[in-house]
């Protein structure tokens, strides 16, 4: 009898720990919650304030699971603004100063992949001047910095996974029909 009680206790404790951790990671919220927490909604995803501490907000990313219900995917430990976001069906990009951070969004937290592109390195000092938008798996931006001691602007095309960068010869090569903040619901 003691063995049965011990086994049942171990199983219950294991279920309690695994159940609690899964519930907190996959928290579901309604669209009202997103809006009440200064959220941004996209076609398939949303971002809302997750926590407010010491006058600093942290955000969570949610996947739409029904027309007005979202499932929490992961937490962003940084403060963001709407104009720093670029979203596509598969990526969410946060663009700040000289850095682009992309999150490849899939259905679960285990599948979220973070990618990053830094323009301000020890060798090159560039900042992102303008984000033109997204088209056919490429992000188009302009970067400003010094080259040979002179102020310079370059027009750059990045693959959606930020793995490759092409410097364009001129702004005229940036497509005019780019979509900025694609799928942003207003």
Give the role of each language-model region.
Residues 71-78, 110-123, 165-174:
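Beta-propeller fold detector
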Residues 1-4:
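Positively charged n-region of N-terminal signal peptides that target proteins for export
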């Amino acid at each position: 009898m003691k063995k049965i009680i011990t086994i049942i206790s171990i199983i219950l404790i294991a279920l309690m720990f695994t159940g609690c951790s899964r519930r907190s990671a996959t928290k579901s919220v309604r669209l009202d919650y997103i809006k009440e927490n200064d959220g941004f909604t996209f076609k398939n995803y949303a971002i809302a304030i997750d926590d407010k501490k010491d006058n600093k907000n942290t955000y969570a990313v949610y996947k739409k699971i029904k027309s007005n219900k979202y499932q929490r995917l992961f937490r962003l430990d940084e403060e963001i603004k709407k104009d720093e976001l670029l979203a596509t069906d598969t990526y969410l990009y946060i663009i700040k100063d000289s850095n682009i951070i992309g999150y490849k969004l899939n259905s679960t937290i285990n599948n979220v992949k973070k990618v990053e592109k830094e323009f301000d390195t020890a060798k090159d000092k560039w900042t992102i001047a303008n984000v033109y938008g997204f088209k056919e798996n490429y992000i188009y931006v302009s970067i400003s910095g010094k080259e040979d001691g002179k102020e310079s602007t370059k027009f750059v095309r990045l693959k959606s996974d930020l793995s490759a960068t092409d410097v364009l010869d001129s702004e005229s090569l940036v497509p005019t029909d780019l979509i900025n903040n694609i799928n942003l619901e207003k």
